[in-house]
Amino acid sequence: ANSEQAATPDTWFSHKVKSSGISDQKSSGRCWLFTGTNVIRAQVMARTGMKNFFFSQAYNFFYDQLEKSNLFLQGIIDTRKKPIDDKMVEWLFRNPLSDGGQFTGVSDLIEKYGLVPKEVMAETYSSDNTNEFSALLKRKLREDGMLLREASEKGASEKELEQQKVDMMKTVYRMLVYAYGEPPTSFTWAPKINGKYTEKPKTYTPQSFYKEVCGGEDLNANYVMLMNDPSRPFNQVYEIDYDRHTYDGHNWLYINLPIEDIKEMAIASLKDSTICLLYTSPSPRD
């Protein structure tokens, strides 16, 4: 009996943040995007009175992959003078893009492209299962990266390479449309409760929807990433170079703190009914 009780998880919590519904990333590496937008989702539900609401993950993931493709190709142009066995060049070709990420990527994408409700741009097979299409896109990017280096070796100017990149990005965009659908530029929406509109439907752009319905919060200014990395000194700020989602965006920036400090902040966040975003690397021992 004792062993059975020990195996039963304790589901009692002293404090709960009001939320509703579970967002499912399926077989994709988009945990960072789901968790990041869930912070805003709870705020939208509280602001509108809706009992359930979801953002379109396919919308922001489309632009995530578009921006990462540009980040890679621009990186190839920036390193065109370096030998092919240069560590940075090797890293670029080994990691042209991924479906993973972190909160600075969420904030940069939302700031640039806004947000849309799930019903405006639904999930597709490829967005729920990212591995297959991601492999195709990586292959295309590596091919284009080599073409840019070859053009540079033949004397192409930086301006000519930039134009070549624009043409390559058109193909990338078309591939993404086939996989995830074409992102909307405007849509009509209004909050619903029990299947009925609570106000007159209004036309939004993704950017105006984020500002007017979601509050338009400056995520980069109002949120910080905390990390517990015992291998590095605590109480210091760390930045991981080139770990970003957009070329002109923010690198992964975090404050390294003892786990006891992070626990205190997490508890304070929950008591304030503010969702605390959590990334973790679980192991069989956890």
Model-derived segments and their meaning:
Residues 239-243, 247-276:
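Active-site acidic/histidine clusters and adjacent loop/turn architecture
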